[in-house]
Amino acid sequence: MGVPRLGRFLEPFGKPVYFSSYPEVPLNCSLVIDGPSFAFWLWFSQGIVCSDFQGYQKAVLDFHHLLSRLRFKEIEYIFDGGLPFSKHQVRVNRYQQKINDLRSAYINLCVPIAQHVLMGLAKAKVIVCNEEADKYCAFQAKKLDAVILSQDSDFLLYDIDTPHYGYIPLQSLDVTSNGISGRKYRFDEIQKDFHFDLHILAAYLGVEGHPLDLVIDYHNTFEHICKILENSVKDKFIEKLVSKEELTRVHAFYSLNDLKLETSTINTFMWGRVQELLNSQLQPAEIWLPQLLELPSKHCSWLESAPLRLQAYANFSKQMPEFGTEVLEYFRLSDRLSKRLISVDYDYATVCETLDSKFSNWNLPHRLVLWTLRCMKNLNNITATSFLLMHVSLFLGSPMNLQPVEPTQEDIASVSRFIATIYSICMLIFSEDKEQSSISFQEFVSFSPLSSTLNFALFHQAASKLKTGKSPLSIVTDKTTASLTYKMYKDLTNDYSDIYMIMDIWKPKRKRKTKKDQS
């Protein structure tokens, strides 16, 4: 979150910096990247359409490959393992605001996608810390003599004295094929231009966790605020504006002399919201399910896949006694944020046991999609075939003969149900005992379940064509795509006996003979 207005106030104090894509010698410094900030910045800077998860995956890979060419000593991506309870009300307010803002749906999925793609496909160094990433980023930057990429004004206030340290705001970056330029900030260099401690300015503007009775100046200009603080320090009246206790707290907030930082990294295999659940200091433990694109009048997409998550919670509970036997889930219900308390005192079960070892003859990307469709209720053959066409087309890299369409409300609901289900299956995979896992870790990280083979625009376009009576064979451009899609479809329908058949789209329509043909 950072300190309100501090980044804007101190923007002129940055110095230009440039990193060439073709350096003659390796750089003397490392690079530490705030994972969540990077994920959101890239999503918005690339103008990603909410349905194009695969396009976002490509953007993540391309940017990492560009950074790799800059020849830093090391590149580390650091992701959150959970938010402190002090941000609970902020989180509640933001969640509620987004319920009625369909444009913001799916955005939070960019963080687990970026983490999985970087760790698995890019083979980058990914670290997950047990709380927010920002303080651990500063800790690692000091340890590695690194530059930090982030979008958090808190980094302006860490007094790190290593030779090459600096904070570069992501929004200051100008990225080209020849390199990256931006603006670099250091606390010690900025401090030289002020006659009072910059932490006093931060405390005056309001640092996270400040006392509720602290009077914060929301309106004065930067110059006027600096004049007030400078005169107050000179006249020794500063405690009338910022108490001694609050200033001590702010200095401690930006101190890196915390022994917990030495042991704050945790399992990088799991996505942040699952890590947050496991490392929650609350009883019961809490999980915030990502918001999806759905109308407030519709049923919550997460309810359908609740049994999958229940088994995941039970597995965590059996392996970690301190986890407890209850979980509090936050999710959307109608047009408001809701929560429910779940008892998770059940026996341990692997993914394959939970899903009855279905589709075991398929490799994991195909099996995950088949599992997802099998767990969705009231599915019809057109919807199922459209998802399979989307998946196979992207998996094989084969285009389809499709036109842009306006998604129907029914199809939007199907997409959100699909995401909720595949996310819940991944949580079940995370919950397995790694020594007795039924799923190969290497196979799971070799593709990103939320982006490798998902582009929901293709689903909407395929569904639109199939609803008009078109055959899947008229949509695909090669026999391999058609054959693989049909094999997956047959396996699904053989197991999913109650799938609703709208029309026999796979059976080619016979051409009626005309009198001319008969003659």
UniProtKB/Swiss-Prot annotation:
Transmembrane segments: none annotated. The keyword Cytoplasm applies. It is found in: Cytoplasm; Mitochondrion. One of its GO terms (molecular function) is nuclease activity. Its main location: cytoplasm. The keyword Cytoplasm applies. Disulfide bonds: none annotated. GO terms for biological process: DNA repair. GO terms for cellular component: mitochondrion; nucleus; site of double-strand break. Keywords: Cytoplasm, Mitochondrion. Pfam families: XPG_I_2 (PF12813). Belongs to the asteroid family. This is Asteroid homolog 1. It comes from Schizosaccharomyces pombe (strain 972 / ATCC 24843).
